[in-house]
Amino acid sequence: MRKIIPINNNWYFKADYEEGYEKVDDLRSFENVNLPHTNIELPYNYFDEKMYQIKSCYKYPLHISEKYRDKVIYIHFEGVMAYAQVYLNGLYIGEHKGGYTPFDIRIDEVYDWKKELNMLTVVVDSTERSDIPPKGGQIDYLTYGGIYREVSLGIYDDVFIKNIKVETHGIYDNEKSLNLIVHLENLNHQSGNVKFKVKINDKNGKEVFYKEFNTYLDAVKDVYSFNIENLKDIKLWDVDNPNLYEIKVGMKINNFSDEYDNKFGFREAVFKPDGFYLNGRKLKLRGLNRHQSYPYVGYAMPRRVQEKDAEILKNELHLNIVRTSHYPQSKHFLNKCDELGLLVFEEIPGWQYIGNSEWKKVAEQNLREMITRDWNHPSIILWGVRINESQDDDAFYKNMNKIAHEIDPTRQTGGVRYITNSSFLEDVYTFNDFIHDGINKPLRKQQEVTGLEHNVPYLVTEYNGHMYPTKRFDNEERQMEHCLRHLRIQNASYLDDSISGAIGWCAFDYNTHKDFGSGDRICYHGVMDMFRLPKFASYVYKSQVSPDIEPILEPVTFWARGERSIGGVIPLIIFTNCDYIELQYGNKTKIDNIYPNRDAYKGIPYPPIIIDYDIVKPEMIGAWGMVWEDLTLKGFYKGNKVIERKFSREPIPTYLYVVPDDTILSATQKDATRIVVKILDQYGNLLPFINEVIKIEIEGPAKLQGPNEVALIGGA
């Protein structure tokens, strides 16, 4: 049998842990909380990061039905930051180092069946311990604290399926195959004849395979492998058509049984010296890095919000890859990447610092836990086995690569560095290239970076970021240059076949330590802010999609004559995927058939339109002394107008835009959604310099995250 019971509601929390709390049963001084939970709610900015670097205590009064007395019972933690010590009825039963990977603690052997309630206690150390990655040195992000992911109770028979791994083969054949590897937990060393039932369904629930396998269960063997062949009419998983299959593995031996299910996809992902190939098709990778942090609550966001980030990256920014900087991220985020067709480069926790031998052991364990949790995700195409931007440590990294390849021989490894001529021990040379300062070349040639005389599989994993921090409320000129830097680098990536792609720094602004950022504990490095609201630079990525899917027409302007130095709006950069546009300035100037600037940007699929004085004269578009007029832009695709934008010469607050991402939330578990508030002008455009205070009131069984009075930031 298998029964998984979520235990996320009605925990009890105390922020000021004192020795002996693990034996306390009186919960009157504890706060009632639900998981995911942050150990302290932080301000949006200007706070002391030591606020969350505390030792806290969580308690859960646990009742397990008497009918499970003879079963094997585990508590499963998805993520606790950063060092967890677990107790049951005051008795220590286990611990875990590392805040980004899951762990299990067995409790059936110590559970007191005579008690109505057993007290589960988790002491959480969220201080920056130097023995746990990524801690030990300076870190350009915050790690927050608490039991910030979900917890569940797992109830099993003496023999149960601990994990399965699906390795697909022959993806170009008419009849495909796979190797199913089943990992068992055989706690009492049972032996005898065992039957495995394997069923595979497509995304519509249609059965595509069923077979029973009979074998012998060896008391000391815990891994069993089965070849499944002659799979017909199988559809490949791809970024455009992410076909997923569900596999269900049933097991029965003596009086014990179990069933384990997971999802997977048939696909081949390979980095080569001349680029990246997905299912034999060369694909230029275009992506951004993602931190899993949010305003106020840090990492502690539930499933819906984690999934929303994947939707933003894939469906709003039209990326085809994301890097999980700099740690394994929520299973809900990764599951959504599988569903949407968003490729993932997942890496271990770390940031520049390499610790002592004990620290390295934790890093090795983090790597094992990451891969065994996530090895069936078709979206994951690369394991990051190196501490981000660390110096070379050949012995350590040879071992990390060995571990990754032993656990998962089906994927390549990468190791992100910023140093050139680094020891190349992985399968893919992954490099943070910050060469571009707005003037010089956008990207280095790979041999200039690697120091090798031949090309190798090569991926740019960061660019821009700290080179040009930009706020959503910055002036138009700075935001325009921010756009151009992202544009130049993406264009250069597309023009160089030896570069598999480029992953920019980064998708969203994020909180950071005092040693970094703009002094207010925020790094404004994103193409969106912390609330996932777009900056102009997001249009570089947003526009890289077929107009058949979504026509895009986004000018980089507030449409104000005096916003830029000296004045005017020329050059006017317009990010679009239209064939051409038409410009109308008031009733005075009309220019037809303005085409994208393919001469300047030959690489990127959809280059921007740049309107300069070769296209329009100053007097045609409101020179000084002339009357400022409205702007109308019309985008055309295949000869038809598909999109139109208007900008007012005299914008005034006209609309209060209040739109939630979701209108229905779960009442049975912790849930959350974002509500976007904007002040718009008469044409529906954001008013970027309005900073009015808004007051938020909630009716019904919901709680606001953050303050109930906030000032608009850049109009939203």
Curated annotation (Swiss-Prot):
Q: Which Pfam families match?
A: Glyco_hydro2_C5 (PF18565), Glyco_hydro_2 (PF00703), Glyco_hydro_2_C (PF02836), Glyco_hydro_2_N (PF02837)
EC number in record:
3.2.1.23
InterPro entries referenced in this protein's UniProt entry, alphabetically? Beta-gal/glucu_dom_sf, Galactose-bd-like_sf, GH2_Domain-Containing, Glyco_hydro2_dom5, Glyco_hydro_2, Glyco_hydro_2_AS, Glyco_hydro_2_cat, Glyco_hydro_2_CS
What are the UniProt keywords, alphabetically?
A: Glycosidase, Hydrolase
Q: Which domain of life is it from?
A: Bacteria
Q: Where is the active site?
A: 389 (proton donor), 462 (nucleophile)
> How does the annotated pH dependence read?
Optimum pH is 7.
A biological process from GO: carbohydrate metabolic process
Q: Provide details of activity as a function of temperature.
A: Thermostable up to 70 degrees Celsius.
Kindly indicate whether the keyword Hydrolase belongs to this entry.
Answer: yes
Q: What induces it?
A: Induced during growth on lactose. Repressed by glucose.
Supply the enzyme class, top level. Answer: hydrolase
- Protein role: Displays beta-galactosidase activity with the artificial chromogenic substrate o-nitrophenyl-beta-D-galactopyranoside (ONPG).
Which family does this protein fall into?
Belongs to the glycosyl hydrolase 2 family.
PANTHER family per record: BETA-GALACTOSIDASE, BETA-MANNOSIDASE
Describe its partners and assembly state.
Homodimer.
Q: What is this protein called?
A: Beta-galactosidase
Protein source organism: Thermoanaerobacterium thermosulfurigenes
- Which taxonomic lineage does the organism of this UniProt entry have? Bacteria, Bacillati, Bacillota, Clostridia, Thermoanaerobacterales
